[in-house]
């Protein structure tokens, strides 16, 4: 028997489904018992503090009901991304109605008892969040911090050609910078290889206490706006369900058929021409179906519908009748049986199995997640038989490795960035792939642009790159986001939100593991002499170090071989944010590939060829974390050894900075005994660090040895010479060597002439660069001589 999905009878069932979702959503706000109002409502049935939001709910439930309809009609693989921040009930209510919630949480049964538990737990101690948190079936996007819904949807459908991301965008959310720029995503979705995004702008007109911009914009101007970005908006407007149901059904059919037509043409004709994708603009009142007014003020269709629209709680039942009237307006007896189960005629129109948006495998670890097939990183090793003699650019070396990662993983590995792949010297990847770019290509002026490619860096937006990568890894694939170190601060709150997702998801047995999020910080603070002070900020190291240690790794490889070893680790890891600070400029190469592997595996190591303590207790410990810190420390050690060959020096190179933390703070941390093995209990430690110094001081605070002299970035910068950036922050060889003398009281007299010579070199440096515009030959031409 053929089903007429647009018939009044079918749409009447859709309406019942919608009312059921609305009923559940209101119940979750207010009730902790008596979920179907089968007896008179009393104070103990109501929460002491109803917490949550109402304004966006009915509109989203309406959209969700109609998405279910097109899933059934067209046999779609579709999932839901809830952009509007405060609408946690939407995905909970709908996943409860379709049974997914009970599949995952069997105690939340499809009856009165289960409904009572569902209501009580919402925004309740020990319960669930008021957003689409990881606890919510079908969610890959919490929506607490606004602006990333489309980016996440796009990241998810890349290389998933059969999937459609139904992304509901709040009209308030659409005013954020990240969301505004994400409308440009049309230029990067390949209709042959990728799936599709169906944005639905939920235009209810109001934010917390202000109107929205789109809410006061005419349809004509909205149409022009979206058409300029290759979207074809389909408008649906109204507040009468009898009229809006057929209107949205027609709009959804039109949108899905256009998506299918675009993909069919592209795939049958191998034609990846930039299409015009459909989207829906859905105008319905904020707080739709809720109280019309309260105490003389308008509620429905007003900002006042945003949160809890009527004042009823366990301690104030004066207006309980209004709450009951609201709930009963959905006619729950038409929707639920006496035992609390859903009526059969409503069940008939709900998708089943993996067709349910809440059960789509893409939302729980991906459709077909696979580990990466990695090349042997040792095959790309740089010769370091004479330490420091070989000069290479670490990112160029690594790009050859990444080129072959792409070759071995042609459909589940991507590079993302804000137009910085070339600037960050990842040249090698373009030997095997291109940038994915759907706009016109001008061969005489463009480079590596093509409709299909494994690099997505042609939009200058850190938010887009980060959001795309998050959507990609949350759906089981792998990748990295490479950007300038200072401008990764643009997305540090996104990194925080991703960390929070990882943490909460990891606490759920049913959530599958995610590949790690890999962030590559290049063009770093001590290499930004040419762009200056604005481009100098290593603070993401400190920002991420403040998060739960189980989910954060920070690597500071000093050379190409160490970067290769780090890459092998991060691409095999899961459930982490891997933050890698690396060099793109020509730098001396220090560690053999096996030394590098050991440094990465252990997190740090004593470098015998740069130490003179011969296993005995040293006079001074030098430590370095980062490219320039390692270079300057080795140069300082050479200076000291040449002048004081009897000084017993130990050099510790640190790659995994957070490994130094106490096990009381980080389960991977070194024990006190291990820490003392490297740094002693009381000998002076001169620590050259790539970032802000307090991170190192915090690490040493819990240790025996407080005899610490940290030289990091001291917030001094300018457009100057490369070495001068280090001098400005006293993270140069001369200041490090001076610090080592000052740290040893016994050398106050014997080291005085040496300290003066260091001051003389600093004065010479300052004079020379202001005359020549380049660094001293003694710096530019410096070579490691060795200590033995």
Swiss-Prot record:
InterPro entries: Phosphoketolase, THDP-binding, Transketo_C/PFOR_II, Xul5P/Fru6P_PKetolase, Xul5P/Fru6P_PKetolase_C, Xul5P/Fru6P_PKetolase_CS, Xul5P/Fru6P_PKetolase_N, Xul5P/Fru6P_PKetolase_ThDP_BS. It is an enzyme of class 4 (lyase). GO terms for molecular function: aldehyde-lyase activity. Its cofactor is thiamine diphosphate. Its EC number is 4.1.2.-. Belongs to the XFP family. This is Probable phosphoketolase 1. The lineage of its organism: Bacteria, Bacillati, Bacillota, Bacilli, Lactobacillales.
């Amino acid at each position: 028997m053929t089903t007429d999905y647009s018939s009044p009878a079918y749409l009447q069932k859709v309406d019942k489904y919608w009312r059921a979702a609305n009923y559940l959503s209101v119940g979750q706000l207010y009730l902790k018992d008596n979920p179907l109002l089968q007896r008179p409502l009393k104070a103990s049935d109501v929460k002491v503090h109803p917490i949550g939001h109402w304004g966006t709910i009915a509109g989203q439930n309406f959209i969700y009901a109609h998405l279910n309809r097109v899933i059934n009609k067209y046999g779609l693989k579709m999932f839901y991304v809830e952009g509007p921040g405060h609408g946690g009930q939407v995905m909970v209510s709908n996943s409860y109605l379709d049974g997914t919630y009970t599949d995952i949480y069997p105690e939340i049964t499809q009856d009165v008892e289960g409904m009572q538990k569902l209501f009580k737990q919402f925004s309740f101690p020990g319960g669930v969040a008021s957003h689409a948190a990881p606890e919510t079936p079908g969610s890959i996007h919490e929506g607490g911090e606004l602006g990333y819904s489309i980016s996440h949807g796009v990241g998810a459908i890349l290389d998933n050609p059969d999937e459609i991301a139904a992304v509901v965008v709040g009209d308030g959310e659409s005013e954020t910078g990240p969301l505004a720029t994400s409308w440009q995503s049309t230029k990067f979705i390949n209709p042959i290889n990728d799936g599709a995004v169906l944005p639905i702008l939920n235009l209810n007109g109001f934010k917390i206490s202000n109107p929205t911009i789109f809410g006061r914009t005419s349809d004509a101007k909205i149409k022009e706006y979206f058409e300029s970005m290759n979207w074809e908006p389909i408008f649906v407007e109204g507040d009468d369900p009898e009229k809006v149901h057929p209107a949205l059904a027609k709009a959804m059919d039109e949108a899905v058929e256009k998506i299918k037509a675009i993909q069919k043409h592209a795939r049958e004709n191998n034609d990846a021409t930039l299409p015009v994708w459909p989207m829906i603009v859905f105008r319905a009142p904020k707080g739709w179906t809720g109280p019309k007014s309260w105490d003389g003020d308008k509620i429905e269709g007003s900002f006042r519908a945003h949160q809890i629209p009527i004042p009823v709680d366990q301690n104030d039942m004066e207006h309980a009748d209004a709450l009951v009237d609201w709930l009963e307006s959905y006619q729950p007896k038409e929707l639920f049986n006496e035992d609390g189960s859903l009526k059969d005629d409503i069940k008939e129109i709900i998708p089943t199995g993996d067709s349910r948006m809440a059960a789509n495998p893409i939302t729980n670890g991906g459709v077909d997640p696979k580990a990466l097939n990695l090349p042997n990183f040792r095959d790309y090793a740089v010769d370091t038989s004479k330490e420091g003699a070989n000069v290479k650019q670490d990112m160029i070396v690594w790009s050859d490795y990444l080129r072959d990662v792409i070759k071995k993983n042609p459909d589940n590995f991507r590079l993302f960035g804000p137009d910085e792949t070339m600037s960050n010297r990842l040249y090698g990847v373009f030997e095997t792939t291109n940038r994915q770019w759907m706009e016109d290509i001008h061969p005489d002026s463009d480079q590596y642009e093509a409709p299909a490619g494994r690099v997505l860096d042609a939009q200058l937006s850190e938010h887009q790159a980060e959001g795309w990568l998050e959507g990609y890894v949350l759906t089981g694939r792998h990748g990295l986001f490479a950007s300038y170190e200072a401008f990764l601060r643009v997305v540090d709150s996104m990194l925080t939100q991703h960390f929070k997702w990882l943490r909460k998801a990891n606490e759920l047995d049913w959530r599958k593991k995610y590949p790690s999020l890999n962030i590559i910080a290049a063009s770093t603070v001590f290499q930004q002499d040419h762009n200056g002070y604005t481009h100098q900020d290593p603070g993401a190291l400190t920002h991420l170090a403040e998060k739960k240690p189980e989910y954060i790794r920070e690597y500071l490889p000093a050379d190409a071989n160490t970067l290769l070893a780090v890459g092998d680790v991060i691409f095999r890891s899961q459930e982490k944010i891997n933050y890698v600070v690396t060099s793109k400029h020509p730098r001396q190469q220090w560690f053999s590939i096996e030394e590098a592997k050991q440094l990465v595996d252990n997190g740090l190591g004593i470098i015998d060829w740069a130490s003179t303590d011969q296993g005995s207790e040293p006079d001074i410990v030098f430590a370095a974390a980062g490219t320039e810190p390692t270079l300057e420390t080795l140069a300082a050690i050479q200076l000291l050894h040449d002048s004081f060959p009897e000084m017993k020096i130990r050099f510790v190179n640190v790659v995994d900075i957070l490994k130094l933390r106490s096990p009381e703070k980080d389960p991977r941390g070194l024990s006190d005994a291990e820490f003392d093995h490297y740094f002693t209990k009381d000998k002076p430690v001169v620590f050259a660090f790539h970032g802000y110094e307090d991170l190192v001081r915090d690490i040493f605070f819990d240790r025996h040895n407080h005899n610490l002299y940290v030289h990091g970035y001291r917030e001094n910068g300018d457009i100057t010479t490369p070495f001068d950036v280090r001098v400005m922050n006293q993270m140069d060889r001369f200041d490090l060597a001076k610090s080592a003398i000052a740290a040893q009281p016994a050398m106050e007299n014997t080291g005085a002439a040496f300290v003066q010579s260091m001051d003389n070199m600093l004065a010479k440096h300052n004079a020379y660069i202001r005359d020549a515009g380049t660094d001293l030959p003694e710096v530019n031409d410096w070579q490691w001589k060795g200590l033995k």
